[in-house]
Amino acid sequence: SACVAWSGEHGNTRRRFYDPERGYFRTTRICSFTRMEALQHEMIDIINNLPDYTKVGLASFSTSGYRNNKVWEDSRNELAELGPSNSETRQSAIRFVNSLSNSDPKYWGGTMPWDTLDAAFSDRLTDTIYFLSDGKPNKDRDGFTWSSNDYDSVADHYAALNASRVSDGDKSIKLNTTSVGLNSEWMQLLSSKTSGEYIRVDDI
């Protein structure tokens, strides 16, 4: 995973990290916390603060075939009601989020959110999406190399899905985005066109 903050100290072993500009590398520098840890902290905070009656679905988006391309079993078939803070359902949701860092980062996969977002927009009960990411997509919606030319088309696509939902008598979806460890212009645009909020998280 990418390191958000380095401690300034060095350890005895070399660990593997990711840099968006140079790819994967190994170093003895000690990382205070990674983007994945910041993302998990933010998501768990969201889960802990949702009302008991909230029905949620959780999914992590990644490259097909990789370990972090998965859904939370409790919401595989339908949204699950969280219940009280000590409920098994809420604790299961937190365990799912924590499981995202269980393996070596090389097995996590890339950033491919389209199928997951489309599935969320097709659920008639969904009214809010919390979309967290620590990187830019590997490919655009058509499978081509991601570029700044995709920013508007992606935001327009989900704005159009919202318009279709309203015309079908469903609620529009508020898409809140959280960018972890970097500024994300395309996520800002995505939220602005779906009445959501964009935030950037740099620490835990």
Q: Model features per residue range: what roles?
A:
Residues S1, L39, L58-F61, A120, ...:
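DG-centered beta-turn motif at the end of beta-strands
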Residues A2-L58, E81-T89, S101-T111:
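…and closely analogous acidic/polar surface helices at protein-protein or active-site interfaces
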Residues S7-H10, S103-P105, G135-V201:
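VWA/integrin I-like adhesion module and closely mimicked acidic/polar interface patches used
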Residues F33, I44, S75-Y130, P137-K139, ...:
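Von Willebrand factor
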Residues T34, S75, T89, N149-V154, ...:
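Alpha-helix capping and helix-coil boundary motifs
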Residues E42-Y53, F61-S64, F96-S103, A119-D123, ...:
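Structured segments of extracytoplasmic/periplasmic soluble domains
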Residues Y53, T126, D170-S172:
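A general structural motif
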Residues G65-K70:
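Secretory-pathway/luminal and periplasmic proteins that interact with or process carbohydrate-rich
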